[in-house]
Amino acid sequence: MSDDRKAIKRALISVYDKTGLEDLAQALHRENVEIVSTGSTAAKIAELGIPVTPVEELTGFPECLEGRVKTLHPKVHAGILADTRKEDHLRQLKELEVAPFQLVVVNLYPFAETVASGADFDACVEQIDIGGPSMVRAAAKNHPSVAVVVSPNRYEDVQEALKTGGFSRAERTKLAAEAFRHTATYDVTVATWMSEQLAAEDSETEFPGWIGTTNTLSRSLRYGENPHQSAALYVGNIRGLAQAKQFHGKEMSYNNYTDSDAAWRAAWDHERPCVAIIKHANPCGIAVSDESIAAAHREAHACDSVSAFGGVIASNREVSVEMANQVAEIFTEVIIAPSYEEGAVEILSQKKNIRILQAEAPVRKGFESREISGGLLVQERDLIHAEGDNSANWTLAAGSAVSPEVLKDLEFAWTAVRSVKSNAILLAKNGATVGVGMGQVNRVDSARLAVDRAGAERATGSVAASDAFFPFADGFEVLAEAGITAVVQPGGSIRDNEVIEAANKAGVTMYLTGARHFAH
């Protein structure tokens, strides 16, 4: 593309967000740019003592319908859409007595913010902008002749362009792309909201008839899951791990993000102070402690200290100096927490490569999706909120009711097993995992792996959780032989009676939840 700068002689400004408007208007006025504006924007500019032409004066038609119609007029849109490279367009403008615009500055009604505020349906509908997107799209389409600006963050660029003879063709193209993304995001937000309103009234399904998402490129990553795969990070509208603040360390990798997401979610599954250590999206250890977050970290690390080497650590509480000193002794890829005690970051930063992140708590509602060939699978997030996740609703199927202390361990184990890839068996004792068997294609092998990871001493007297039912008694029998005292599992197998009989025979307490927590 050639430079092809277009000097800015005439500008159309219509903004809901008045941030930076004063400086922008003054800069345009200094360069003798004619300003046409609407409603409250025109009033604000006039208050500054800057000449401004109200749009109704331009069109000869008054603003009407409570402001719904202001700029939807040929006198406005012809000035935006005229391709000044074409003699025929210039001739028609002259015949119609319409002057072209070289700059259009528009931002839109705050629809998303209105929805987020809890406003009623009619109030939200009133914030659906019509004229604004029309002007933005028109200017973006005609970027060979017009520069379009949709964010106050670009006002300094406008001031610079005024000094250099206008925006270049390449700059106008970039601004046009931003503008189309802006209106696309706006339309997706409106369409998604409308679909959700309809779904809420549909007795047959809770899912909207249309799903749209918008994500913006944050940065390219060094590579993907493997070095031969390219990768990038895109961010959405909901704040979370992707927007985490990094205090120290190398750039986050693709695998760092996937493991950190698993760790962050695992830690926040628990209401008590919790630390989760994750490797390849599976727990090396999870622990809770009312004593201190440092104690939780010690117990989580003790579960599988070998696998924890090079893992990701997530804490659902502030990282203390004591915990930071412990982590600093271990090779760790990432540590993530909601906050850090004064001095903790400095201690952790002594390790050159550790990535230290601070993030907001993960969203505890909504849906999650997974791409498949030709489509998208969408499901409600598994948030440990099923009826069977409450121990008050468990059924005692075998053995005697356990003590409050043992029940607390069973509750912990049941919550923790959600974060383990299926088939999953998790052993726990005193609020900490002691053995985890994950990702096996049969449950008996997961049981063997969990027992093997725990070792005979730690397995004895521990409790166990299974993410799904035991299809045969053999998986349970592995646990019973290892000295497990109580088991919590969903139940629902056609061989439940055989499994329960085996539990009674072994003298092991068994609770059935009626809820399942597969994770694939």
Swiss-Prot record:
Coiled coil: none
Pathway(s) of this molecule: Purine metabolism; IMP biosynthesis via de novo pathway; 5-formamido-1-(5-phospho-D-ribosyl)imidazole-4-carboxamide from 5-amino-1-(5-phospho-D-ribosyl)imidazole-4-carboxamide (10-formyl THF route): step 1/1; Purine metabolism; IMP biosynthesis via de novo pathway; IMP from 5-formamido-1-(5-phospho-D-ribosyl)imidazole-4-carboxamide: step 1/1
MGS-like domain segment(s): 1-150
Pfam entry (one): MGS
Reactions catalysed according to its record: (6R)-10-formyltetrahydrofolate + 5-amino-1-(5-phospho-beta-D-ribosyl)imidazole-4-carboxamide = 5-formamido-1-(5-phospho-D-ribosyl)imidazole-4-carboxamide + (6S)-5,6,7,8-tetrahydrofolate; IMP + H2O = 5-formamido-1-(5-phospho-D-ribosyl)imidazole-4-carboxamide
Membrane-crossing segments per the record: none
EC number: 2.1.2.3, 3.5.4.10
A Gene Ontology BP annotation from the UniProt entry: 'de novo' IMP biosynthetic process
InterPro entries membership: AICAR_Tfase_dup_dom_sf, Cytidine_deaminase-like, MGS-like_dom, MGS-like_dom_sf, PurH-like
Single GO MF descriptor: phosphoribosylaminoimidazolecarboxamide formyltransferase activity
HAMAP family (alphabetical): PurH (MF_00139)
Entry-linked PANTHER family: BIFUNCTIONAL PURINE BIOSYNTHESIS PROTEIN ATIC, BIFUNCTIONAL PURINE BIOSYNTHESIS PROTEIN PURH
Record-given protein name: Bifunctional purine biosynthesis protein PurH
Organism of derivation: Corynebacterium glutamicum (strain R)
